[in-house]
Amino acid sequence: MAAKWEKLEGNVGVLTIEVDAKEVNNSIDAAFKKVVKTINVPGFRKGKMPRPLFEQRFGVESLYQDALDIILPKAYGEAIDEAGIFPVAHPEIDIEKFEKNANLIFTAKVTVKPEVKLGEYKGLAVEKVETTVTDEDVENELKSLQERQAELVVKEEGTVENGDTAVIDFEGFVDGEAFEGGKGENYSLAIGSGTFIPGFEEQLIGLKSGESKDVEVSFPEEYHAAELAGKPATFKVTVHEIKTKELPELNDEFAKEADEAVATLDELKAKLRTNLEEGKKHEAEHKVRDEVVELAAANAEIDIPEAMIDTELDRMVREFEQRLSQQGMNLELYYQFTGTDADKLKEQMKEDAQKRVRINLVLEAIIEAENIEVTEEEVTAEVEKMAEMYGMPVDAIKQALGSVDALAEDLKVRKAVDFLVENAA
C-alpha cells in the first residue's frame, strides 16, 4: 500500500491511497464468502453456490461494494498512520479505480486536527477568591436546615400568604372554552414557588379556606403548547385548605435530629462551619482552575474546523439526553415543553461546544509543550481511588474502563491544569 498526503487550504487535505491488487482480490474473496451464505440456488445447499456460477449469474461486480466495505477501513487506517495525520471527522471517499486483478486507487478528503499556536499560559493573573466563613453564613445554613425540616400544618384561620401551601381545585378557560391539561383537584400549590403561570399564585394571596376566585392571567409567549402561547386565560379556583410551615425550635434536640454525629446545637454549628469552609475552599480552587484554563485558551491562536464543533455538539446532545432520561424525560418531550427542536438546541449549545473544543486543543498543546507524562503507578493509584469511591473491587473498575488509555489521558489533562495553576501569578 502507498499513501500520499497533500495539504489543502485550512485544516483540510487529501490522501491518495493505492492498494495492491492482491489485497483487492482478497477482499473480493472475503465478500463472496459473506454474500454466498445468503443465497439459495436450486441444486445446491444454502451457501454452497460455486464461485464460477455466482460470477456467471451475478457478475463479479456485484461483490465490489461488500469488498470495498472490507478493504477501505483497513487501507484508510493504515494511510493516516503512514501520513501521521489526525482526522477529526469522517473522510469524503472517492473511488478512482476498483476492479478485480488491479490496484485499488482512492482519495480521502480529510479534515485534520488544527495547529495550535500557544499564547501566554505561564504567569497568568487570576483573582483570588475569598474563602472566609462568617457567622452569618453559618446562621443562613442553619436556617436552611431548619426550613428543610419544617412541617406543613393546617392553618385553621387566616388567609393565604406567600410561603403557604394552598390546596386548590382549578379549571382554566381560553376564549370561554376549557382546555386540555387545565384542570386539577386537591392540588397542593406552594405560593411563591413559581410553579404556575406568572401572576397566578400572587392572586391567591388573601383568600380564605372555602373561598373561590376567577384568576386572570396570560400564557407566556414562549409557552410549550403553541395553541395557548400568548393567550389570556381565566382560571376558576377554589381554596380548600391552607397549610403553613411550622419550623422546629433550634435547640440540642433539633441538632441531634439533623445530624446523628452531633449532640448539641453548638456542635452542629461547628460542623456546618467546617463544611462551609471546605465547600468554599473547593469552590475557590475550581474557580481558579477554570479561570487559568480559559485565559490560556483565549491567548491561543486556533482555526477550529467546523467538523470538530459538530462532533462536540453531538456529544453534548447525547449527554443532555442522558440527563433527561435520569429525570424520566426524553428529547421529544423536552422539545414539546420548551417549544424548541434539535437545531435550536444545538444553536443554544454551540458557544459552549466551541469553548470546549478550544480548551481541549489548548490543553493537549500544553501537554506536548511541557512534556507532561503519566506513570503506570499514577494510573494504578487512580484506579484504586475510583474503586474506593464506588465501593467496587479494583478488577471490576478495570473491567468497566476496558482500557486505561482514556484514564491516562484524563490524568494528563489534570496535570496540565495543575501546571497552569502552579505557574499562575
UniProtKB/Swiss-Prot annotation:
UniProt key word Ion transport: no
For the protein in the UniProt heading, the enzyme class is: isomerase
UniProt catalytic activity = [protein]-peptidylproline (omega=180) = [protein]-peptidylproline (omega=0)
**Which compartments does it reside in?**
Cytoplasm
Name the UniProt key words of this record, in alphabetical order.
Cell cycle, Cell division, Chaperone, Cytoplasm, Isomerase, Rotamase
| Residues covered by the PPIase FKBP-type domain | 163-248
Q: What is its EC number?
A: 5.2.1.8
Residues of the signal sequence? none
| Family annotation (InterPro entries) | PPIase_dom_sf (IPR046357), PPIase_FKBP_dom (IPR001179), Trig_fac (IPR005215), Trigger_fac_C (IPR008880), Trigger_fac_C_sf (IPR037041), Trigger_fac_ribosome-bd_bac (IPR008881), Trigger_fac_ribosome-bd_sf (IPR036611), Trigger_fact/SurA_dom_sf (IPR027304)
A single Gene Ontology CC term: cytoplasm
Gene Ontology MF terms:
peptidyl-prolyl cis-trans isomerase activity; protein folding chaperone; ribosome binding
Q: Which GO terms describe its biological process?
A: 'de novo' cotranslational protein folding; cell division; chaperone-mediated protein folding; protein transport; protein unfolding
Q: Which Pfam families match?
A: FKBP_C, Trigger_C, Trigger_N
Free-text note on domains in this protein's UniProt record: Consists of 3 domains; the N-terminus binds the ribosome, the middle domain has PPIase activity, while the C-terminus has intrinsic chaperone activity on its own.
Which family is annotated?
Belongs to the FKBP-type PPIase family. Tig subfamily.
Chain's role: Involved in protein export. Acts as a chaperone by maintaining the newly synthesized protein in an open conformation. Functions as a peptidyl-prolyl cis-trans isomerase.
What is the name listed in the Swiss-Prot or TrEMBL entry for this protein? Answer: Trigger factor
Which lineage ranks, top first, belong to the organism behind this chain? Bacteria, Bacillati, Bacillota, Bacilli, Bacillales
